[in-house]
């Protein structure tokens, strides 16, 4: 991205918001030279998967030949109930994952994208069977089955992209909201993939197939995947898949990327930004750049915390900031997943604990004198251990059942890699995140209410119409 100027509008939740999920399947069985040429799902006659030869498309930057399927994505058709169920799954899984990650990151800042991670794993789930599918459904809080689940994610993706718009402000600067999502499938060129699996990816996720050769050119395949991720994330995630992550046993990589760029409905005046003290989670005092403005924000409070919601232009997406009282951050943070049933509670979607409490507390608008630090950081994390801890165990072992992907070889997940980036300034937010799953074989007061965010806080970037949790994290040190 070019250096930011007044003519380059900022993205929601930070300088840039992007989430990418990559899944690589690695074979545990024998090799075969058979290829997939065409596949048609009888349930979806409008979708035809046609795989051209690897020479069809060449990535000039990496000299890797990529064959892309000509896939037709179905129009969104899920009911509102199913759409909200998919969004609830993202929130329930997000708070579960937050609980695990916060215990492994210490006092550090944290950001990740439940939306990106769940979408990528939903694509993986399309090829799962037996106990592997059951564990994934429980861990991801899926309460829909079969086509209904994947159609719900298709409709949710369309709902998120429908908020996009761009306009010029009174000074002639471009402002707006941009949420861009993309899915792709990278497969070993001589592996026969099941047609129903490919059709589901095509119809409900818009994911084409790129044929690569990890058996003899794993590094070139890695470079091609990273180039695609970098392009989808405006170069915020330049190298999602690290060296050595792909090898001759790699058979499949599923990638999801989300990029969010949005302008505040009420921008902060840069002239009002001053240095200010911020007490970190470790108890140290650092000097942060503190933005300040008075505006009518949705505001609420509960036991030991206050919440304020900063909407982006259009009013459909917002960043909610939950600010625990001084000395109560750990206590309040522990309530984030208080109501979440975890991997064993599959009877109903989680209520999300603290997030839902904060949302319910928000009034229509309260005049708030808000002081908020600017921040910019990224989180890189391997999610294998976290997913196993949440109940998704068999997917990573030799007993994994991904026979819905291919009958030719036995596949299991070897790792899940996630990277997220977020930046928040006076104009708005931009964020980026990437995940790779690697598979082996109330009333307005007379005076403004003052809220000075000078201590650790939790943030949730949400789509207000569906409740989809796009980004979730915490800021314990805005200068880190």
Question: Whereabouts are the PLM-identified features?
Answer:
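Charge-patterned, phosphorylation-rich low-complexity C-terminal interaction regions
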Residues: 39, 335-337
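Extended hydrophobic
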Residues: 254, 306-322, 446-480
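Conserved structured core elements
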Residues: 87, 91, 111-115, 130, ...
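Detector for small/aliphatic-rich hydrophobic stretches
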Residues: 3, 16, 20, 26-214
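Non-catalytic, conformational "gating/processing" segments within enzyme and secreted inhibitor domains
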Residues: 61-64, 107, 145-333, 352-445
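Short, ordered coil/turn segments that flank beta-strands lining enzyme active or ligand-binding pockets
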Residues: 26, 281, 426, 464-465
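N-terminal secretory signal peptides that target proteins for export/translocation
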Residues: 1-9
């Amino acid at each position: 991205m070019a250096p930011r100027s007044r003519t380059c509008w900022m993205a929601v939740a930070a300088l840039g918001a992007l989430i990418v999920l990559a899944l690589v399947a690695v074979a545990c069985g024998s090799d075969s030279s058979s290829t997939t040429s065409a596949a048609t799902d009888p349930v979806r006659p409008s979708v035809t998967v046609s795989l051209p030869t690897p020479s069809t498309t060449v990535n000039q930057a990496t000299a890797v030949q990529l064959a892309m399927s000509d896939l037709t994505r179905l129009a969104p058709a899920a009911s509102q109930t199913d759409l909200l169920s998919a969004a609830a799954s993202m929130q329930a899984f997000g708070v579960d994952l937050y609980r695990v990650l916060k215990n492994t990151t210490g006092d550090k800042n944290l950001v990740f994208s439940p939306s990106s991670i769940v979408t990528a794993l939903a694509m993986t789930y399309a090829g799962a069977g037996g106990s592997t599918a059951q564990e994934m459904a429980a861990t991801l809080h899926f309460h829909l089955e079969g086509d209904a689940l994947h159609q719900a994610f298709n409709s949710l993706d369309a709902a998120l992209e429908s908020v996009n718009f761009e306009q010029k402000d009174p000074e002639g600067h471009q402002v707006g909201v941009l949420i861009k999502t993309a899915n792709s499938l990278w497969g070993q060129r001589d592996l026969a993939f099941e047609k129903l699996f490919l059709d589901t990816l095509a119809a409900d996720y818009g994911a084409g197939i790129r044929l690569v050769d990890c058996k003899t050119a794993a590094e070139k395949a890695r470079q091609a995947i990273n180039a695609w991720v970098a392009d989808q994330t405006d170069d915020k995630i330049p190298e999602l898949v690290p060296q050595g992550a792909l090898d001759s046993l790699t058979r499949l990589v599923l990638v999801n990327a989300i990029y969010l760029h949005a302008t505040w409905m009420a921008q902060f005046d840069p002239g009002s930004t001053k240095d200010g003290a911020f007490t970190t989670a470790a108890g140290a005092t650092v000097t942060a750049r503190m933005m300040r403005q008075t505006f009518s924000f949705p505001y609420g409070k509960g036991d030991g915390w206050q919440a304020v919601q900063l909407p982006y232009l259009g009013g459909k997406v917002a960043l909610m900031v939950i600010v625990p009282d001084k000395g109560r951050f750990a206590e309040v943070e522990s309530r984030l997943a208080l109501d979440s049933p975890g991997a064993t509670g599959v009877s109903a979607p989680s209520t999300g604990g603290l997030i839902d409490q904060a949302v319910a507390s928000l009034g229509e608008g309260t005049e708030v004198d808000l002081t908020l630090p600017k921040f910019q950081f990224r989180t890189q994390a391997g999610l294998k251990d976290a997913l196993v801890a949440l109940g998704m165990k068999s997917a990573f072992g030799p007993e994994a059942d991904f026979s819905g992907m291919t009958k030719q070889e036995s596949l299991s997940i070897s790792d899940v890699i996630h990277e997220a980036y977020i930046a928040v300034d006076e104009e708005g937010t931009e964020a980026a995140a990437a995940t790779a799953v690697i598979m082996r074989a109330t009333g307005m007061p007379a005076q403004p209410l003052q809220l000075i965010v000078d201590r650790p806080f939790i943030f949730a970037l949400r789509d207000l119409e569906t409740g989809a949790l796009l980004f979730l994290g915490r800021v314990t040190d805005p200068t880190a």
